[in-house]
A protein has these predicted regions:
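Terminal amphipathic alpha-helical/low-complexity segments used for targeting or macromolecular assembly
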Residues: 1-64
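Flexible, glycine/small-residue-enriched loop-and-beta-strand segment within the central core
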Residues: 71-81, 86-136
């Protein structure tokens, strides 16, 4: 499975419960952890932070974006960040289902974006799927 296939499948909102999807999510999580450990492990200039986040997100983020580490994600490749975005310290992005921050968006300390959901009963917890929410404007 590749990133495009995963994102297309996740958009269908069907459970992410196949072995192939599980392996892919594990690989992406490992890659994201490597970069976030590097980001969060020592001081970096704002330009260095943006460079590390660009590696993590898979595209070059705008120079106007400002992020105060530590920053956490368990996927990294389904985050879209517009111009002039500010993300304060200790934010968590579970972005398998997608997180989009439009131009000028400001995120405070300790915010959690959880875009996956699973059943409450133990037998249903392996059936991970995209979380449902209503968009607020």
């Amino acid at each position: 499975m590749n990133l495009s296939e995963f994102l297309a499948f996740a958009a269908t909102r069907r459970p992410l419960d196949t072995e192939e999807i599980g392996r892919f999510m594990d690989e992406m999580s490992d890659s994201a952890r490597r970069i976030t450990f590097e980001l969060n492990g020592s001081y970096h200039t704002p330009d260095e932070v943006r460079a590390l986040l660009s590696r993590l997100f898979g595209y070059e983020i705008d120079p106007s974006v400002r992020v105060f580490p530590p920053f956490y994600t368990d996927f990294g490749r389904n985050i879209a960040v517009g111009k002039g975005v500010f993300i304060n310290a200790c934010c968590h992005f579970q972005d398998h289902g997608g997180v989009t921050l439009g131009d000028g968006c400001q995120i405070g300390h300790n915010v959690v974006f959880a875009t996956l959901d699973h059943g409450i009963a133990p037998a249903e917890r392996r059936k991970i799927g995209r979380a449902s929410c209503r968009e607020r404007v």
